[in-house]
């Protein structure tokens, strides 16, 4: 860091940057999971009116597996629930980190305004 900055202020700045990176990473994770949720919703909409015993294929990793509509709806519903949980947990973590970030930002502003080094 720059000359004349106290080790405490330097630590706060590093923590501030770290929190900023964590927030950015969480935002990206949340966005990615929400996109997955949209894909599941589209798939469920496509098959909603089909008979439960009709055959279909579902993607498992790089494989396509023969299934039926009923089983596929169940699996997609389970995935959707899992993604909903992941989004809620990530958003909760984001809010916690955001609070820490804002508190630290206020501390840094106060330190800079008071001329602390």
PLM segments and residue spans:
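Generic alpha-helical secondary structure signal
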Residues: 7-10, 70, 74
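Amphipathic alpha-helical coiled-coil segments
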Residues: 12, 16-26, 30-33, 37-40, ...
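Short coil/loop "hinge" linkers that interrupt or connect long alpha-helical coiled-coils or helical hairpins
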Residues: 46-71
């Amino acid at each position: 860091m720059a000359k004349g900055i106290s080790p405490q202020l330097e630590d706060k700045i590093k923590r501030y940057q770290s929190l900023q990176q964590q927030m950015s990473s969480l935002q990206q994770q949340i966005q990615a999971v929400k996109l997955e949720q949209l894909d599941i919703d589209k798939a469920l909409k496509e098959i909603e009116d089909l008979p439960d015993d009709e055959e279909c294929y579902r993607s498992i990793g790089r494989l396509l597996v023969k299934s039926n509509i009923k089983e596929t709806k169940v699996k997609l519903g389970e995935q959707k629930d899992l993604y909903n949980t992941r989004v809620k947990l990530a958003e909760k973590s984001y809010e916690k980190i955001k609070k820490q970030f804002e508190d630290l930002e206020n501390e840094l502003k106060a330190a800079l305004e008071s001329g602390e080094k």
